[in-house]
Amino acid sequence: VIKAQVLAGGRGKGGGVKIVETLDEAKAFASKLIGSFLITAQTGKKGIQVNKVLVAEAIDIKKKLYLAISIDRSTSKITIISSTEGGTEIEEVSAKTPHKILKEQINPLLGVLNFQARQIALNLGLTGSLATKGSSLIKNLFKIFIENDCSLLEINPLVLTPDDELVVLDIKMDIDDNAIFRQKEL
């Protein structure tokens, strides 16, 4: 899989992601991308220039999920957003099937409580040992969110493989501009 590395979402729909079968296909697509301007719903009409690509191994996917942590502007609270409809733009899911998006507010002083992590995992359709793995992932993501002064940490998609493994295929991380001085290495 060849993925354009730009600071914008919607790369797949914008033509910035392609599954290739051969080395020649990979070279051709990467050459086409590098130096081009990728236009997505988040970039505006001018697009963003692609200077790098990521080459990743393709994996078999059983189910695509969505998981994000953000600051809910209407409540000014940290919120975990989850959906069984991963791999597409969450705005689309919200418009067409809002009942498939679940939100859980988190107290920053307490962090993600065990019952909250478990409930989010269950809402994602994870059961048994997968719910345990999902709960652990959720708690670890929250820790990353707090430690790095994030305003958004979005996994789309989080995939379930046929072997029942959870794999983060794409992640977006936005750092709060007011805290960037604390995050020099980022």
Cite the ranges covered by each PLM segment.
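ATP-grasp fold ATP-binding core
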Residues: 1-11, 40-61, 67, 141-145, ...
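Glycine-rich phosphate-binding loop of ATP-grasp-fold ATP-dependent ligases
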Residues: 2-31, 66, 89-90, 154, ...
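Short beta-strand elements
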Residues: 4-6, 68-73, 80-83, 157-159, ...
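Catalytic core of tubulin tyrosine ligase-like
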Residues: 23-43, 120
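A short local loop/turn or secondary-structure capping micro-motif enriched for an aromatic residue
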Residues: 36, 88-90, 175-178
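Hydrophobic alpha-helical hairpins/lids featuring a short glycine-rich hinge
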Residues: 44-105
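Glycine-rich, mobile lid/loop segments that gate access to catalytic sites or pores
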Residues: 105-168, 172-175
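Conformationally flexible catalytic loops at phosphate/diphosphate-handling active centers
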Residues: 177-186
